[in-house]
């Protein structure tokens, strides 16, 4: 990601969790932030990039690359007020149409919106599940109020969440599988071996 108010804290928090295998990159601009996430997705990672309204404009071409490449990518848009650079510390929920239609070629993309600080985990989990299982980028909308808010939150039991089952290429497919090969039930398969 590239630091942009009010989304920067997500990058800061994720950077604290390298011991859990989280990899973070602070890029030189919004375009590089999304393009590097697309590269990570192409390499088989669950990729996430964070931004706010003006950054989504800059990321749109790379987001479309993930659409056409059928790559799992989560784009977190922490919305802020106003057009253009806007008001970075003012909370608004004004990027819904941008999230739904803000790309050329009418490329579709699922959109999920978090409703509160306590709902963010569930919304992020579902965004990742949809991205990985359906090989598509997903936009996760939140806003400055939610991003800067806090609430009592009970750590969830992950066993109670629906399993995430990405369509990996299996070892028995080696030699007779191509990245553009269609699957009868879905679009394409993740072209790396399933993690062990």
Language model region names:
Residues 90-139, 143, 165-171, 175:
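Conserved thiamine diphosphate
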Residues 12-17, 150-161:
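Short glycine/threonine-rich loop-to-helix capping motif typified by GTGT followed
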Residues 187-196:
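Residue-level detector of conserved catalytic or cofactor/ligand-binding positions
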Residues 68, 127, 156-158:
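Short basic, glycine-rich beta-strand/loop surfaces that mediate nucleic-acid
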Residues 6-7, 55, 82, 141-155:
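A glycine-rich phosphate-binding loop feature that marks nucleotide/adenosyl-phosphate handling sites
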Residues 1-102, 107-108, 113-114:
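Thiamine diphosphate
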